[in-house]
Regions:
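Short, flexible catalytic-loop segment of classical short-chain dehydrogenase/reductase
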Residues: 184-194
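Short, small/polar-rich loop/turn modules that mediate ligand/substrate recognition or access, typified
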Residues: 173, 178, 239-241
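Substrate-binding pocket helix/loop in short-chain dehydrogenase/reductase
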Residues: 96-97, 104-109, 209
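Residue(s) in the substrate-gating loop at a strand-loop-helix junction
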Residues: 140
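C-terminal substrate-recognition "lid" of short-chain dehydrogenase/reductases
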Residues: 4, 117, 217-246, 251
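Active-site helix of classical SDR
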Residues: 120, 157, 165
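Alpha-helical segment proximal to the catalytic Tyr-Lys
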Residues: 125, 170-171, 237
Length: 252
């Protein structure tokens, strides 16, 4: 355990699995105080235990549905000003535009975009009052950076996340607030496993996802975590309005 993030209060959405879970463990190991939230409250307790076992301070855990109006605002409003907001919640819709209903679009925008708008809007006043804060948005290389097949809804929402990131950075740079986005390639997470299962043949799906990665393999969640820690730390104090591609060469 080090002290790179000692004393920092960090709020994380979608903390129970995948990249969110790995990030909470790493952030806590660096000395941060974590507010870990997820709709899967059954997994949050095991996360708490894992953080403690890894040498970090026990995170404060809360069930949170980021699509519920007022829920994010109420939770963040009950806390002291945040040092770091990590928006990790997301949903991947599979299919073309002709395979996506209005409900599909609404649901994806609610999770992938509107939840970030709400959390940022709730966190900003406290950050501005202290003239410091780092906002980290989970985006994707599948966005305005690169088009991928069968990702019409997802790519559109993640392009919106990049636009939101740039806008927040531009509006609040003079207030001491930084806002950046992380754009992973294909990461081996429970979310990916669900998408593989939806395709029917899991092994063929894994081969398909792996084939689009020039490195010939999927990323592990632990390979995304270092950039999360960097953006949460004061080491990134001169970085804002940027997106960081951690994609195994997919955007070369």
């Amino acid at each position: 355990m080090s002290s790179r993030l000692a004393g920092k209060l960090i709020f994380v959405t979608a903390a129970a699995q995948g990249m969110g879970r790995a990030s909470v463990i790493a952030l806590a190991r660096e000395g941060a105080r974590i507010i870990a939230t997820d709709i899967r409250d059954d997994l949050l307790q095991s996360l708490r235990d894992e953080v403690i076992a890894a040498g970090g301070a026990a995170p404060e855990i809360h069930r949170l549905d980021v699509t519920e109006p007022g829920a994010i605002e109420s939770m963040i409003g009950s806390l002291p000003p945040l040092d770091v907001l990590f928006n990790c919640a997301g949903f991947v819709h599979q299919g073309t535009i002709l395979q996506a209903s209005d409900d599909d679009w609404d649901f994806s925008f609610a999770i992938n975009v509107r939840s970030m708008v709400r959390s940022i809007r709730a966190a900003l006043p406290g950050m501005i009052s202290r003239r410091t804060g780092s906002i980290i948005n989970m985006a994707s290389v599948c966005s305005s950076i690169k088009g991928l097949p069968n990702r019409a809804v997802y790519g559109t929402t993640k392009a919106a996340v990049l636009g939101l990131t740039k806008s927040i950075a531009a509006d609040y740079v003079s207030s001491g607030i930084r806002c950046n986005a992380i754009c992973p390639g294909t990461v081996d997470t429970p979310s990916l496993h669900q998408r593989m299962a939806q395709l029917g043949d899991i092994e063929e799906a894994r081969r398909m996802f792996t084939a689009r990665q020039p490195m010939g393999r999927l990323a592990g969640a632990d390979e995304i975590v270092p950039i999360v820690v960097y953006l949460a730390s004061d080491e990134s104090s001169f970085a804002t309005g940027q997106w960081f591609n951690i994609d195994g060469g997919i955007t070369i």
